[in-house]
Amino acid sequence: MLNKEDLNQILDINVAWIENCDSTASIMLGMLGVTISIVFAFDYAKVIISTIKEKCLNTSFWNIVFLILLLLTVCSILYGGYKLIKSLVPQIDMKKLGNDEMLCNNSIIFFSSIATHNNYTKFLNSLKKTSDEDYLNDISSQIFLCAKICDLKFRNYKSGLYFSIGGLLGFAILMTLGYFA
């Protein structure tokens, strides 16, 4: 088995990947917010509303298709934003992340487990009772749990990115076509 230093280094790498995902998701949410603000801050909102009104009043097959596609792009943008936000929500329920008898349930590393101690003295006693083998298992458990958290975050980030950018591009294309058609 790897030693403490090796395991701590692996844990640090996993934590860095989680921080990376949080940073990029925050940046993407900011860009999404700025883009939506620009659309509604200038005269684009008037053009969008007049285009939608025109398509609603002049019902034809293509106008109905246009409105349905427009609704889908708005839903895509909203869903993408939801998934980006979801990638930022902390996942701290160890039982949901991994349910294995080998996982350390009373971690001295994981903040949520540490907080279950009623006071500092009880936590300190728990630290003193921890053997080297228990500590290595605790670090290994945290590596596994952090990897699961990281994987879940990046899945949410990736789908949020695709849906929000795809929705924005689709919306821009549809509005351009709707305005000139």
Task: Give the residues covered by each predicted segment.
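Cytosol-facing regions at membranes
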Residues: 1-27, 34, 42-181
